[in-house]
Amino acid sequence: MNLTNNFTLNELIYSTTAEKNKIDNTPSQPVIKNLKALCENVLQPLRNNLGCPIVITSGFRCAVLNKRVGGASNSQHLYGQAADLIVPQKNLKDVFNYIKSHLPYDQLLYEYNKTDK
């Protein structure tokens, strides 16, 4: 199911941890609605501006999966309102700054390795 031109439901719910541990990470309809809004308002506009693929490393997480990966008990991933991402062709700091200046968000976290600063 396409959520936008460049993002599918499958990529927003896929998890190797869920697959490995046989965790059903199927979202409810309200969560799918949230994921669609996330894609329409943040991820697709970001993709359009950057002009290159964005890799979602973590999107929706059901409660069992969220606990398994050590997510916060109030994580927005539980509601389909968060996505962790990388953009292999771009500098992480530049992506962060673009989101910060141009896109709507509730929380924006900049997680990096020492070499990414």
Task: Indicate residue ranges for each PLM-predicted region.
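Catalytic cores and adjacent binding grooves of peptidoglycan-active enzymes
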Residues: 74, 79, 87-117
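Short coil/turn segments at secondary-structure boundaries
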Residues: 30-33, 73, 86-87
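Generic non-transmembrane alpha-helical segments
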Residues: 41-50, 94, 98-102
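Extracytoplasmic cell-surface/polysaccharide-interacting catalytic and binding patches
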Residues: 1-47
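Structural recognition of the beta-strand scaffold that forms the well-ordered cores
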Residues: 54-57, 82-86
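Solvent-exposed, flexible loop/coil residues
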Residues: 11-18, 64, 69, 73, ...
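Extended, low-complexity, intrinsically disordered C-terminal regulatory tails
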Residues: 43-70
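Short connector loops at helix/strand junctions that flank enzyme active sites
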Residues: 49-51, 78-82
